[in-house]
């Protein structure tokens, strides 16, 4: 829609390339940075960064349609910039020596006991790149849409740098 879809609390791009988290947005409705072309045109009311002919070829005008990569130098530059964001700041959960603080060790115990790794697992503490949407009981009809249909769940975000990315869904 012209107003966007789904939940609108923006997920941080900090360290995103380093995590390889995959699709963008809580609703996982973009599979490449270049998909923002549609929002530039509809939501922002702009003319876009690629020609109308290229944008309207095949399914390219749909978020998960034909790839837009290589069709606009500006969109590719934006994607390259996002891809350069591969550094995470030092964690407040670690001491200057790199060891987990006592509070972080207690948090690790809760994480293990509650089975958090079933969604927030692996090196990125996420669910694998946006292909698995999860509903942790916070999704309702008013949460928005995903690709024109009711939002079935969210793309489980990384827990890296979680102290800086509130609010949380559970």
Regions found by a protein language model. Name each.
Residues 1-170:
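Periplasmic c-type cytochrome electron-transfer domains
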């Amino acid at each position: 829609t012209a107003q966007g879809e789904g939940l609108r609390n923006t997920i941080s791009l900090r360290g995103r390339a380093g995590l390889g988290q995959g699709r963008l947005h809580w609703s996982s409705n973009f599979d490449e940075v270049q998909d923002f072309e549609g929002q530039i045109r509809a939501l922002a009311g702009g003319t876009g960064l690629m020609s109308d002919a290229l944008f309207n070829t095949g399914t390219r005008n749909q978020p998960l349609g034909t790839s837009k990569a290589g069709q606009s130098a500006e969109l590719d530059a934006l994607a390259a910039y996002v891809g350069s964001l591969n550094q995470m700041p030092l964690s407040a959960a670690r001491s200057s020596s790199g060891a987990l603080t006592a509070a972080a060790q207690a948090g690790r115990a809760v994480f293990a006991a509650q089975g958090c790794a079933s969604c927030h697992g692996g090196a990125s503490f996420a669910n694998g790149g946006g292909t698995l949407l999860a509903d942790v009981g916070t999704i309702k009809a008013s949460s928005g849409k995903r690709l024109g249909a009711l939002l079935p769940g969210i793309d489980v975000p990384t827990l890296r740098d979680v102290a800086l990315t509130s609010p949380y869904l559970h």
